[in-house]
């Protein structure tokens, strides 16, 4: 029985398509829906630039407060994009969303950790992000999640939409 699900989004071009699948499944099963977006950690170059311009205290403050601000902003962006996509009739669907979480880390690991932490019954993902070329049918994150997930994975194919010209 499916009582709760996790929709993992990259906030890319095809995120609204995958979201529609997630909401339709949540409606069908009358299930709770959680949303997660992974934010890659800051690269070494960016970190070294910050270190050269900020003292240790300012750097620590940036890491704690800056990251919290960015994460809160992304969480709000996700909710706003859902509202925009669903329109006025979608308020009931929005009520199914229990939480939007933005977590820093490797995307596949973040998704798998959230599956376990939230004890969801189903994971919903797209086949790949907007950055992967048409010759790659399955992205790195989707591949790792499929291989390592301990719950069923609902995989939304994005290649067909690209071939039809995004109608």
Task: Annotate each language-model stretch with its function.
Residues 37, 127-128, 157-158:
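Short secondary-structure boundary segments
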Residues 122-147, 162-165:
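Glycine-rich, Arg-bearing micro-motifs that act as flexible, cationic patches
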Residues 1, 80-123, 160-167:
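Structural beta-alpha unit
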Residues 36, 99-103, 154:
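General small-molecule cofactor/ligand-binding pocket signal
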């Amino acid at each position: 029985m499916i009582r709760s699900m996790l929709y993992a989004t990259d906030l890319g071009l095809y995120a609204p398509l995958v979201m529609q699948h997630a909401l339709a499944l949540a409606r069908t099963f009358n299930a709770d829906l959680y949303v997660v977006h992974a934010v890659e950690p800051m690269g070494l170059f960016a970190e070294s630039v910050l270190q050269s311009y900020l003292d240790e205290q300012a750097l620590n403050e940036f890491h704690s407060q800056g990251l919290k601000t960015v994460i809160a902003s992304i969480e709000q962006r996700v909710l706003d994009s859902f509202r925009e996509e669903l329109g006025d009739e979608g308020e009931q669907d929005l009520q199914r969303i229990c939480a939007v979480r933005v977590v820093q880390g490797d995307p596949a690991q973040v998704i798998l950790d959230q599956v376990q932490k939230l004890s969801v019954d189903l994971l919903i993902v797209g086949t790949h992000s907007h950055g992967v070329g048409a010759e790659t049918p399955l992205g790195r994150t989707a591949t790792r999640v499929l291989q390592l997930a301990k719950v069923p994975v609902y995989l939304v194919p994005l290649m067909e939409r690209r071939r039809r010209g995004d109608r």
